[in-house]
Amino acid sequence: MSSVTEVPVAAPKSAGTQRNIAVLILGRKRPGFDQEWNKLVCQRSVAAMQDLGFHCVGYDLPVLDDATLRVALERVRAAGCESLLMLQPSMGNGQLALSLSQAWPDPIVLWATPERPGDGKVSSCSLVGQHLWGSMLRQANHPFELVYGDPGDAATRTSLVQALNLASTAARLRNAKIGVIGSYAPGFIDLAADPFLLRRTLGLQLHALSLPQFIDRVKSIDEAAVRRDIEAVRELGLRLKDVTEDDLGVNSRCYLAMRQLMQEESLAGLCIQCWPELPEVIGQWPYLAIARLTAEGHAVAMEGDVDGAIAELMGRSMGLGNAFLTDWLEHDDKTVFLWHPGMAPLDMCYAAGGQNGPCLARHFNIVKPLVVDGELRSGQPVTIARLWRCDNEYRMTAFEGRSIPPRRRLTGNTILVEVERGGLMRRFDDLVHEGMPHHVLMYYSHCADAHRRLARMLGVRWFE
């Protein structure tokens, strides 16, 4: 008989809106350690997960052997759980780490809890048990995250959310499909994607889509839907500069066509060859459409940057919010000036209607509508990151700084980032020699460590 009994805890809060998480508790067939402490830790751990807004599945019956593990996994799969958290309140059977690795291909989050405070006997060896499991999973080449701490500790809860987001990101990538309309922009060969390397490394599939067929789709969007969308654009309150409201219709068509295509093809992300065909054939750049879609939480990239769209998808899945996909325009040793011609997510710009708010304008080069001109917000923590392919492998990097007021103003979207520790001259040179493409992503948070941990989880080579 198990020495871990059913765990009574309060019902989850707002269960209808919660994300289902598999929470398995490793029990013991033989009595041992401090089972009162074990039970208390289980109750507090599950309650902490529920307080964080997760709907926990599987915690009510302990995992004792292969048979109970199979039953537990059937339940969590039926509930659609993307992430699996393994609790080991007292040290259990290490052999089950390999059984779980065989049955659950996605990353596993191991949570080790503290010993009972005070003198006397060892109460649980929870950290020792999870150390054992982690070592075995690594030697089996199975990705995992390890969290250690008390259920009531704020830092522990933050680590749990991060670890579960990382695990679900890897799981989502394995089942994701990214669409690419056309190819990379002319000459931008550094953005070329390898569909089979993507499948082998990240698990996702690349779906090639016809640019001429997309143009036909843009032209055939229902007029009533276009009129409704133009009203939605007006409500954004964006100023007009060298454009008129007559220019809004074509970009609404692009916006609706991209949304329609993503829905029809079940795409988790989309990138588009935005020039030269679109400005020449439909008369506009689709950049307002991209700025709106990214602000709404869709992973959409320009110039055929497949890896850029994938990185956007990763960031959103990790809970990092939207990213600005941009050129690295210039730098000195402590600052980098990022610029692109007008498709930054609207929520990363200053508020519409304000002094520095964005406006709708014409592209600086092929002088046609419709781009979003506007600085991005300064005074914010910032991370600059990139995922890329080189030498038949994937690589990733990220580093942190802070956005500061720009030294000069350009059309398009710009932001000046200061890196306190400097070293950007050497960093840029090293990154180019590592094959990093000319686009990077910028997030409004310090999240370099989240990128490092995701790279480790995915088996992607990390560049510090």
What are these regions (language model features)?
Residues 39-41, 101-103, 193-201, 286-289, ...:
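Short, solvent-exposed amphipathic alpha-helical segments in soluble enzyme
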Residues 42-86, 246-264:
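Alpha/propeptide regions of enzymes that mature by internal proteolysis
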Residues 297-409:
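C-terminal catalytic subdomain
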Residues 92-105, 279-291, 420-421:
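Short Gly/Thr/Asp-enriched flexible loops that form oxyanion-binding sites at enzyme active sites
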Residues 2-63, 189-238:
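N-terminal glycine-rich anion-binding loop in soluble enzyme alpha/beta folds
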Residues 2, 62-174, 186-187, 337-339:
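Cofactor- and metal-binding active-site motifs of prokaryotic enzymes
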Residues 46, 128-321:
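Conserved, well-structured core segments that form the ligand-binding/active-site neighborhood
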Residues 367-464:
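Extended hydrophobic packing segments that form well-structured cores
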